Amino acid sequence: MKLTLDPNGWVVHVDQLDVLDVNSTERDQLRTLPYTNLLVVTHNTQPLTIDQYHQFTSGVFDNLNNDLPAKEKIFVEQTNKEIIRVTGKKDDHGEITGLFGMPDDLPWHCNEPGRTANERPDALCLYGVEHTEGSITGFTNSIQALKDLRQATDAPVGLLRSLDQLMCYYNYSGSTDNGPMAADVNYQGRTGFNKFVTQNKSGAQGIHWSPMQNPRFYIGKTPVPYAGQQAWFSYLYKFLTQPKYCYAHQWKDYEIIINCQWLSMHARPAFENIENRLLWRAMGYVSPFDGSAIDTGQLELRQ
């Protein structure tokens, strides 16, 4: 397995990995780098069966999540609800068979942001099954963004002094078929509070935020006044999605990405071929570890 560092300084690329025969050293790197560096892109070139992909994901996580409150149709059969279809493909009744099947934009978000740390999966793993070329998924780096945010001179009144006390409440329902705010809801997001500034399993500190699910800001148990809600949301959305904190992954079939779901968001620009594109998605958990000794800054830069 060969590791290279993206020119942006944080995304790790993986080449020359036999995903059907991952050794213990490779597995350890695939389990830790998505937390220290937030995104790992494996440029796999061999097609996988669902059993092979299921086996791969079971190896890079301690456990896989299987309790998403969604319709049966989105789960890949015989995977214990651990593998989900992400596609706009329709069945014989005209119903979309996977998550997020609309051709228009899928806004910046992370999955089920209101769930507690004990329940919520740490990371997602996506595999490009077919017809992915031309599709883009964007990812963010809130570790670096938080460092810069603390030094910002143009932040709205009260935001910076409240950062470490800030909580977000998510009370969200939305359709995984036809867009986040569609009326035909087939998925009920679970509600709850989470810290705005938090840590992932590696000990890295960053920002946990998901603007698609309409978060409400609280300081402790006190809601931020309406004017502050609006100003803070607008400022943070623009700040956290600046190009310097974003990576646009241009999909090719058979590639695999693993992305931290505590300190990173993802989004998908409009894609007209969504009815043919198919991704498989797994979400999982790892045990806490000390990521401070992991230094990818010495890796060769990817050309």
Protein language model annotation of sequence segments:
Residues 2-39, 44-253, 262-303:
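Non-heme Fe(II) oxygenase catalytic core, chiefly the N-lobe of the double-stranded beta-helix
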